Amino acid sequence: MSTTVVLGAQWGDEGKGKVTDFFASTADLVVRFQGGNNAGHTIVVGEDKIALSLTPSGVLYPNCVPVIASGCVIDLGFLKQELKMLQDKNIDTDKLAISPNAHLIMPYHKLLDELIEESLGENKIGTTKKGIGPCYADKIQRRGIRVQDLLDQEVFEKKVKSNIEETNLTLTKIYERPPVVAEEIIEEFNDYRDIVSNHIKDTSLLIENAIKESKTILFEGAQGTLLDIDHGTYPFVTSSNTSAGNAAIGSGVGPKNIDRIVGVTKAYISRVGSGPFITEQKNEIGDYLIEKGAEFGVVTGRRRRCGWLDLISLKYSVRVNSLTELFITKLDVLSGLEKINLCIGYKYENELLTDYPYKESVHYKAEPVYKTFDGWTEDITSTKNFEDLPKNAQTYIKTIEEFIEVPITFISVGPERTENIII
């Protein structure tokens, strides 16, 4: 048996798609355990770029079963489109397994998400307005609608009509918007019933049986650790637990079944939307990283904020997730920079902080303390061995590894599937 969790060690967009694709090539199951279509990753296959937001990356491999587990929230309209896109590329989607206990994103969730975000004005969270937060809120309030509900017309209609009553009070009384119509939602979701009936499986049992049969399982996280609802830069976080502990909870397996926890980080750091960002570069360095790194959101197309790699937050991610190793992506983006900085501490009120601060206000006021390295000019995209990297690049990687006290076992030096260094 081999079970591996792959997750982001930053604010998402770390290049997890390429890493999960690397693992998926030998996996029997690839399991999404949280989130919805609010995060995306792009997998480059030759000249083709395949952008996935909800379907696990294992769908690209004929011998792998992609699983959307109970910790996820599902926009069935979006899923239908994504499956159609894959089918048009002659990719088999019949093997997709969907948990009956995953919650459904309803049209009113997306409407509420947009209205709530707009009402925050300058204090906007930066949500993708996909309905993720309101869907998880309904789940916690025990009024959510699950995948299995769609298989029973009477149950589904009853739950929709019950939820609509409260939702319409919010829409009409608070936001002064017209009410939504239950019958229209019911009719829309009748068109999605085939998706559910064709793919619904007891995914917890499916994973358990795979473990008993010593199969290889990959648990694929979305977003990143610093967006975790409990451990991230609250309130500028997502609505689910993105850290490693949720791989077990969101999939319906026990934590003792997890063998390996891989964190993914870029050689620098980026963030989408609002929230504190201590090493952000609002200058030509930031512009350089954005342009060379193609730092624009897969889902939203938004320009990402970029900055130097923050080892304090990275070491925090190591702790929160019990990372067994670290994968670094986009090292090639740093090629061409004369000097490169690594954040090794925070300065706050004349005090040097070397542990990640729990106090929210510190993240807005702290200043980064940098260690500066000489850069390199060589094109490293064809490099296959660590020893063949420029000496300055080797020093940069070794410094990161020594600071976080976790081995770096994989370095991506280009966007292609094969442009990697395995250590």
Regions found by a protein language model. Give the residues of each.
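Non-transmembrane, aqueous-exposed alpha-helical and coiled segments at domain scale
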Residues: M1-I423
